[in-house]
Amino acid sequence: MKKAILGKKLGMTQIFNENGKVIPVTVIEAGPCTVIQKKTVEKDGYEAIQVAFGDIREKLRNKPVKGHFAKAGVSVKRHIKEFKLEDSNSLEIGQEIKADVFEAGERVDISGVSKGKGFQGTIRRWNAHRGPMSHGSKFHRAVGSMGASSDPSRTFKNKRMPGHMGNVNTTVLNLEVVRIIPEKNLILIKGGVPGPNKGLVQIRNTVKA
């Protein structure tokens, strides 16, 4: 069964398993997400649910968004996201999706916006090799060759060059759910997940199952 939830990355820590082994985990505050709209094949051409997550002051939302929440009878939230789920008909508007939809041992895919690194050179951005650092060398951390000269007399598209790094949508596949703490809506994921602390993340069933 397809499952999905929005969450907020709180940070990383480490826990011990039953064998006493240290496991690095990312703590995610998952939900509660409130269903605010149901998409149907008859009306919209496909089936999906729209969920909202995170508190926000009402005056920070415009009138169309306020009306959208008022129609659902739900208080205004910060984030809105749509998910295609197999059992979307079983969910009702106003119903909450919480962290306990997942179980320990499940595999999930987590999406978020990666940390922005600003303008970076090819060594950091693309793991390029640097030149000699000794006296007399004129090639230290420069780009190097960008292409042939007379033919084709241009630099090809997608050439690895310096530029803006990070701050892009990133998905990490097949991560393990180590522990669920339902009373606090927390999910502990083995390893790291994209984005900074307090960043928005999406948790879904893995596509590699």
From Swiss-Prot:
The keyword Isomerase does not apply. InterPro entries: Ribosomal_uL3, Ribosomal_uL3_bac/org-type, Ribosomal_uL3_CS, Transl_B-barrel_sf. Residues 141-163 are annotated as: Disordered. Part of the 50S ribosomal subunit. Forms a cluster with proteins L14 and L19. Gene3D superfamilies: 3.30.160.810, Translation factors. HAMAP family: Ribosomal_uL3_B. One of its GO terms (cellular component) is cytosolic large ribosomal subunit. PANTHER family: 50S RIBOSOMAL PROTEIN L3, LARGE RIBOSOMAL SUBUNIT PROTEIN UL3C. Belongs to the universal ribosomal protein uL3 family. One of the primary rRNA binding proteins, it binds directly near the 3'-end of the 23S rRNA, where it nucleates assembly of the 50S subunit. It comes from the Bacteria. This is Large ribosomal subunit protein uL3. GO terms for molecular function: rRNA binding; structural constituent of ribosome. Pfam families: Ribosomal_L3 (PF00297). Keywords: Ribonucleoprotein, Ribosomal protein, RNA-binding, rRNA-binding. GO terms for biological process: translation.
